[in-house]
Amino acid sequence: MASGSSSIAIGGLFENAEVTTSGRPVLRRNEVECFLLSSIDIDSEDDPPRFTALRSGNLILTTHRLIWIPSQSNESVPSSIPLSAVTHIYSHKKSIKSMFHSPRIRFQADPGSIVVTIVFRGKGDFDGFLSKLWECWRGRAWEEEEKSESETSKSGSGTVAQGLYGNDGTVRMVGLAGILRKEQEQWESTDKSLQDAFQDLNALMSKAKEMVSLAEKMRQKLLSAPSSQNGSTDDEEMGSKEEMQQWMLSVGIISPVTKESAGALYHQELSRQLADFVRIPLEKAGGMISLTDMYYHFNRARGTELISPDDLWQACTLWEKFDVPVMLRKFDSGVMVIQNKSHSDEEVMSRIRMLVTKTETLRVGVTASDAALTLKIAPAMAKEHLLSAETKGLLCRDMSPDGLRFYFNLFPEIDPTNLHIVKEFGTYGEWIKATSLLSV
């Protein structure tokens, strides 16, 4: 769910920047993240200053903007500067004085030719960032959409003259000359159709990032949509929501965090991006998903920017430091899963108890597949819950040639001093009645 603050305009230059619940920026259409730095100040070079300085935050360079996000201890508002407003980037000159000061990048921006200084307080690739800033500014990616729309409108404006008279008012040729002319026009029409086809193909390729961006916005709206108040949801609406979730998972992540763009903050930013991404797979999996399955889903969404299992594990362990609604959990068996913080083990145990105390299951027990159908989760996750219930004394296991089955634990209800007394109350009595049906 995207969160933002009220729009700010410091000196008419800064814009409000939307961020997700984990602190990642919400990118715009066709916008791609290029570089990330930590411990960055943004100051005004003018005297008196023309805007309030921004202190100690993360600076994210994209193809369209410079996005400044405050650190956790900072109460400033996430802000951005559009690269389209930058009119000049000053060249960096090394001097003896610069060796004893924090590295700085200065640029001029409209309105009013404001001189802005980016101050590096932490350790970062200064030269790499400056080079990427020049590249993004000169690339002018924000103008590509206007150019593509203009070319598309021009490509469809041509028409072929028909009838007795041509476009210039002259009479069309007939006879053999007319046949040759007609054949030439057909070749020209075919050539034009091929050119249009290739233009459409190029346009389709150029729209790929736009489609991913659209999917990301729809994903944010879907996550922020309020749930039904009466607890009931229309079946058709629910089906459409699940179909939309599956489609968005297949589209992928608009701008995956990479080691090249994030540098030393790679695992931190990867952790934030994973926290945003995991919410839909978690909802689809019933609130809990194994780390192995999430590795598959996350790498599939990242496309060619694959991560290692160790990177995924480190990203999950960093959730303890962030205020995110998900967490990493390790069962006694060693299986690691991702689950919502709102997940309640007591509720799961209650549902398992209801399952194993039914008349049928009192006789034959339950398997992991049976529990998976009841809990609406994967069988592997259901097995972990059954093992956890066994550890808590709720269940007993039975290893047989047919596999592992779990039964309700009746031992606490049996009097060890008189094993032959049958209680008329409790689950033990119900078990006696259920098993007696087998002899009838």
From Swiss-Prot:
UniProt subunit comment: Component of the endosomal sorting required for transport complex II (ESCRT-II), composed of VPS22, VPS25 and VPS36.
GO aspect biological process, one term: seedling development
Q: List the GO molecular function terms.
A: phosphatidylinositol-3-phosphate binding; ubiquitin binding
> SUPFAM superfamilies under this entry?
PH domain-like, Winged helix' DNA-binding domain
Q: Where in the cell is it found?
A: Endosome
Write down the species: Arabidopsis thaliana
The name of this protein is Vacuolar protein sorting-associated protein 36
- According to the UniProt entry, the coiled-coil residues are 192-212
What are the disulfide bonds?
none
Residues forming the GLUE C-terminal domain are: 115-149
What taxonomic lineage is listed for the species of origin? Eukaryota, Viridiplantae, Streptophyta, Embryophyta, Tracheophyta
UniProt gene name = VPS36
Q: Domain of life here?
A: Eukaryota
In this protein, which residues make up the domain named GLUE N-terminal?
17-97
Q: Where is this region: Disordered?
A: 144-163
GO CC terms on record? early endosome; ESCRT II complex; late endosome; plasma membrane
Keyword Signal attributed:
no
Q: Name one Pfam family in it.
A: EAP30
Q: Which UniProt keywords apply?
A: Coiled coil, Endosome, Protein transport, Transport
